C-alpha cells in the first residue's frame, strides 16, 4: 500500500518538475503608485539616519509639496532648525497657514522666532499654545527659554519647574540650575 502511495507522490513530483509553463500567482500585477511614495519616505528617513540632514530635509520638503501632508513639513522644519540648515525662513512661511491646526508647527515656528531674535512673536505663539488645557512640557520649557532670553529669570524658573515636574529631564534640570 505504501509502495503505491510513494509511486503516486514521485509521479506528481516528476510531473511538476517537467512542466514547461511557469505559473505566476498574480499575472496581472502592476506596480502600485504607493510603492513610489513608500520608497521616497524611506529614502528621506535613510538620509536622516545617515546624518545627511540637508538631503533628508529636501526630500521631506518635496514630499510635502507633492502630497500636501503637514507631517512632512514638520519633519523638514525640525531637521532645518535642529541642524541649523538654510531655508529656515522659507519653511516658517510654509508653516504659517497651518499654525492654528498643528501645535507642532506652531512650536517649531516659535523656536524659529526665538532663534532669529523675534522674541515678541515667539512669546505670542507660545502663549497661544499655553492657553490649551494639555500643558505640554515642551511648551513650558520653550516658554521658559523665551523668558530667559527676555531676562525674566523668576518667571522662567517657574515654567522650568512646571516642565520638570511633568517630565524629569536632565536638560530641563540643567536649564533650571543654570538660572541660579
Predicted regions and their residues:
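Sec-dependent bacterial lipoprotein signal peptides
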Residues: 1-17
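N-terminal leader/linker segments that initiate helical-solenoid repeat arrays
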Residues: 14-93, 98-104
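Residue-level recognition of tetratricopeptide repeat
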Residues: 45, 78, 111, 145, ...
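Alpha-helical repeat scaffolds
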Residues: 56-61, 86-99, 121-131, 155-164
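Canonical tetratricopeptide repeat
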Residues: 75-76, 108, 142, 175-176
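Alpha-helical adaptor scaffolds
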Residues: 81, 107-115
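Short coil/turn linking the two alpha-helices of tandem helical-hairpin repeats
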Residues: 84-86, 117, 151
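Solenoidal tandem-repeat scaffolds enriched in leucines and small polar residues
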Residues: 149-179
Amino acid at each position: 500500500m505504501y509502495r503505491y502511495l510513494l509511486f503516486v507522490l514521485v509521479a506528481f513530483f516528476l510531473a511538476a518538475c517537467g512542466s514547461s509553463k511557469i505559473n505566476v500567482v498574480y499575472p496581472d500585477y502592476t506596480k502600485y503608485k504607493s510603492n513610489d511614495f513608500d520608497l521616497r519616505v524611506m529614502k528621506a528617513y535613510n538620509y536622516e539616519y545617515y546624518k545627511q540632514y540637508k538631503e533628508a530635509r529636501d526630500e521631506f520638503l518635496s514630499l510635502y509639496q507633492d502630497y500636501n501632508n503637514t507631517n512632512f513639513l514638520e519633519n523638514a522644519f525640525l531637521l532645518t532648525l535642529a541642524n541649523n540648515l538654510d531655508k529656515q525662513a522659507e519653511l516658517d512661511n510654509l508653516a504659517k497657514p497651518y499654525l492654528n491646526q498643528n501645535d507642532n508647527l506652531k512650536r517649531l515656528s516659535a523656536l524659529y522666532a526665538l532663534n532669529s531674535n523675534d522674541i515678541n512673536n515667539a512669546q505670542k505663539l507660545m502663549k497661544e499654545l499655553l492657553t490649551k488645557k494639555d500643558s505640554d512640557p515642551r511648551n513650558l520649557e520653550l516658554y521658559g527659554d523665551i523668558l530667559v532670553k527676555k531676562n525674566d529669570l523668576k518667571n522662567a524658573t517657574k515654567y522650568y519647574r512646571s516642565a520638570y515636574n511633568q517630565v524629569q529631564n536632565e536638560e530641563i534640570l540643567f536649564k533650571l540650575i543654570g538660572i541660579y
